[in-house]
């Protein structure tokens, strides 16, 4: 974990970031990386529109819920992945040195029935009158995985109102991988803002606002990862995890005088060899003030 230096100034809340992701607002097929919600609270002495030059001044406290599921919750298929209910709690610091934007942090990823996610999922099926799931008994068992994540990127301007940001990311813990990719933004969405990244989709979401330029912004991105290990697959299972993962994403953000709306789509490549198809997730964030 990165050592956090003492900061003389009092910390205040600089902003909140959140993103809801579900395949119900993507391809609508309710399977695999089926849903997640991330909530970030960012604290620091102040936000001036740019990252500080050292770690520890700006801290992000992150909570994330994720459901990973086989395609059929009622009839177990040995050639499909196991159910995963994951709750992660962590702290990350964001800073910039020599033009390189850095994010380093640690999360405790809690999995298994102890999270209560599968119970909540079952209750939702009861409420909607759907068949009772039978795959929860074979879900990834109770455990806690300490997960270190580091991302390094550089924002490069493309004219007056666009930017491109190549990045590299390394993660070790619940899943161990190295990822390279990039994001392009057309419009004012990311201008002087503290941008965070959702781990499942790679979609970027805003925590500390910058100029809040009114109008539409368009985001495009993609990345590829080399996967070394994943605690979400068991060696005894009949499926084979892929060692390469690909993602493509696009999003649109509207900023009004007081309100804002974001909607994005993410294409995910296959995560195990027996997976019959890719999937598309939808992500949404609403901040409405009247």
Q: What is each PLM-predicted segment?
A:
Residues 53-119:
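Long, hydrophobic/aromatic-enriched structural stretches that serve as scaffold segments
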Residues 8-13, 45-58, 96-103, 155-164, ...:
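Short loop/turn motifs that connect adjacent beta-strands in outer-membrane beta-barrel proteins
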Residues 8-49, 54-58, 63-75, 223-233:
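Short glycine/proline- and aromatic-enriched beta-strand/turn motifs that initiate or cap beta-hairpins
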Residues 13, 25-26, 72, 189-290:
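Outer membrane beta-barrel transmembrane domains
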Residues 24-26, 45-47, 67-73, 112-118, ...:
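Gram-negative outer-membrane beta-barrel proteins
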Residues 37-43, 89-95, 108, 148-154, ...:
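Residues on the lipid-exposed face of transmembrane beta-strands in outer-membrane beta-barrel proteins
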Residues 14-22, 59-67, 106-112, 166-174, ...:
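Transmembrane beta-barrel strands of outer-membrane/channel proteins
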Residues 31-37, 57, 83-87, 102, ...:
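Residues that define the transmembrane beta-barrel architecture of outer-membrane proteins
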């Amino acid at each position: 974990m990165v050592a956090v230096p003492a900061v003389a100034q009092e910390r205040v809340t600089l902003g909140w970031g959140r993103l809801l992701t579900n395949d119900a607002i993507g391809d609508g097929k309710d399977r695999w990386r089926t849903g997640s919600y991330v909530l970030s609270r960012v604290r620091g002495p102040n936000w001036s529109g740019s990252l500080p030059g050292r770690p520890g001044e700006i801290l992000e406290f992150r909570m994330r819920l994720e459901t990973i599921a086989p395609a059929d919750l009622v009839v177990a298929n040995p050639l499909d992945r196991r159910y995963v209910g994951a709750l992660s709690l962590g702290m990350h610091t964001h800073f910039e040195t020599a033009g390189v934007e850095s994010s380093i942090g640690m999360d405790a990823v809690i999995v298994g029935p102890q999270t209560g996610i599968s119970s909540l999922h079952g209750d939702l099926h009861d409420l909607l009158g759907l068949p009772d799931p039978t795959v929860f008994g074979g879900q990834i068992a109770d455990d806690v995985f300490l997960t270190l994540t580091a991302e390094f990127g550089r924002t490069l301007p493309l004219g007056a109102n666009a930017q491109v940001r190549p990045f590299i990311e390394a993660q070790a813990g619940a899943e161990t991988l190295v990822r390279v990719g990039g994001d392009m933004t057309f419009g004012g969405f990311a201008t002087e803002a503290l941008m965070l990244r959702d781990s499942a989709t790679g979609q970027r979401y805003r925590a500390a606002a910058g100029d809040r330029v009114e109008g539409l912004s368009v985001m495009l991105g993609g990345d590829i990862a080399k996967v070394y290990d994943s605690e979400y697959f068991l060696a005894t299972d009949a499926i084979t995890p892929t060692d390469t993962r690909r993602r493509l994403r696009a999003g649109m953000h509207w900023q009004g005088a007081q309100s804002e709306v974001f909607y994005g789509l993410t294409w995910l490549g296959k995560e195990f060899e027996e997976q019959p198809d890719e999937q598309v997730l939808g992500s949404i964030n609403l901040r409405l003030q009247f």
